[in-house]
Amino acid sequence: DMGNDVDDAWALDMLHKYADEGRARILAVMLNKEGVGPCQYVELLNTWYGRPKIAVGRAVKKPNITGGIPCFPDTVAAMKDASGNPLYPHRISRLSDCPDAVTLYRRLLSKQKDHSVTIVSVGFSGNLAALLHSEADQYSPLSGRELVTRKVKGLVVMAGHISDPHYREFNVLSDIPSCQEVFSSWPTDIVVTPFELGQNAQLPAACLREDFGWTEHHPVLDGIKVAWGEYRDYPTWDMTGVLYAVEGCAGYFTLSAPGTITVTPEGCTHYVADSQGRHRYLMSDHNQRKLLVEHMRRMVSRKPKNKN
């Protein structure tokens, strides 16, 4: 949900850093926040990190969002340099420039090796639920559920609050029916990075103030200035999902026992241990969180490969 907060942007930053290292290949970025601005912002990020050809899929469902920070993607996408040229070039000018997320999912998944794709969902669940319900098309004779079963290795989701069964977490609350559908029907293993994990592992403001002397302009820092007007400590919610998807636990996380996570009609998430369950969630203790934050600080402040 690019634009509702800046941890989405840092999560994409981390994916590009992993791609720089050859540890990940980014097939596409799917938006589940409406509007052309978020699509433009994702494309300008991909371009800034040296991968302008990464496909961007537009949202297929309007989420139920209330409140939130200013929509910084639109502002950053419109920024100009001293000569009046786009500060962060991008080619998207209208929503129709982007395929819808389900069509893009089906096109890309059909071309991948079986059980080779990891999907990292750090926003709402509308695209994933719609993918499950999609039918055979020109890209694949398989239904959406069959296509996911064949091509997807696993799903990592930033959603919910495991330690507080009464908490209504934003990503869940913004599209409860779709989130219920994903947790009840998704055919692969799901690993959840819950709200409390990122809330208790915060990227320090000092990182933003002190670690980016290598660049005059940075699209994520500019987004933060628009969204907050200042640098401050901030939770690493979405970033934890990307880190786990690429590195696994790696000393930063502990994986729960298998179980089943259900989403209530009110938007709460409940976990029940079950040896046959396909859901797990991430935890971290004090020492793990310290290492986690140090690692993320090094990653996000590192100069991208194409800027060296």
Can you describe what each PLM-predicted range is?
Residues M2-N308:
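N-terminal acidic, glycine/proline-rich low-complexity segments
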